[in-house]
Amino acid sequence: SLFGRRDGQGDIVMPGAFADSLRKRGSGGVRMLFQHNPAEPVGTWLEIRETARGLYVLGRLDKNVQRGRELFSLLESGGIDGLSIGFRTVAAKADRIVKARRLLNVDLWEISLVTFPMLDGARVSNVSSASRALADSLFAKGPTPKRTNA
């Protein structure tokens, strides 16, 4: 999602719109789906955060899922590269001048890899086996144990 840009449905996501949801859910609470289909989870989001430009995501496709393997191949070849958000509107304001709905606060529950995103600029910008290997190692390490003074 890019801030301040109107999508194909007439929505404009405003800076800060994801903040509450990300604070409550974290990256692990937002699902990675294919084409918004809840029956097709394809991986996990490792990092989701707001930047000055919009929503930044870093994810890992699950190689143990057939669709995950297919999507990795399609992403590498450029056959698919769209991203789209699934959310519930918490607060919005109608903008009659540009005939759009400005999304001020949304409850983000999923981000999908899609063929045709509603916002043309919402695209995957980097696909790498190396970053997937790093992601696998980060998951394998687990949390750092807390030190205690006994």
Locations of regions flagged by a protein language model:
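Signature of dsDNA virion morphogenesis modules
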Residues: 1-141
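Short, charged, intrinsically disordered terminal tails
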Residues: 138-150
